[in-house]
Amino acid sequence: NGTIGAIMDDEGKLICIPTVEKVLRSLPTNELAAYAPIIGLPAYLEAVKNLTFADNKPDGYLEAVATAGGTGAIHNTIWNYSEIGDSVLTSDWYWGTYNVLCQEAGRKLETYELFDENMNYNIESFTDKVNTLLADQDSLLIIINTPAHNPTGYSLSEEDWDKVLDVCKEHA
């Protein structure tokens, strides 16, 4: 079970990949225990952008942000980009922690159907839900878990992304 950011065995004991443990134990104490700068290590942030986008960097403002893990990033996003009482949108296949984070922040988690009857990305369901929610609130935070969607493994295609962006641009 690696859904909480750590891998546990069947008895609930933490599993550490031997290669990772070897590298960690080889680090000098000052590298192992030191805090990184609050904004993150510049070389790391640049590497994140390069690995994420490679030759496909969008034209526009682009910045990597260091957070205390993926869950912390989602938590901060919910708090900072939605209002108390608002709905946050994600697909009906989602990591259960999204709901906990929304409830804790006084938001509601709403879902759309990820797949249509042909097991393709369901842009119609996405569009309908976006339109419905934006009829009742001023802005909408949308969590789209791609590539390698957890738990399905599905990744939006470029065509899917174009359709999603078209829906978002209609409300910009």
What are these regions (language model features)?
Residues E31-H171:
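Conserved core of the PLP fold type I
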Residues N1-I38:
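N-terminal "arm"/small-domain region of PLP-dependent enzymes with the aminotransferase-like
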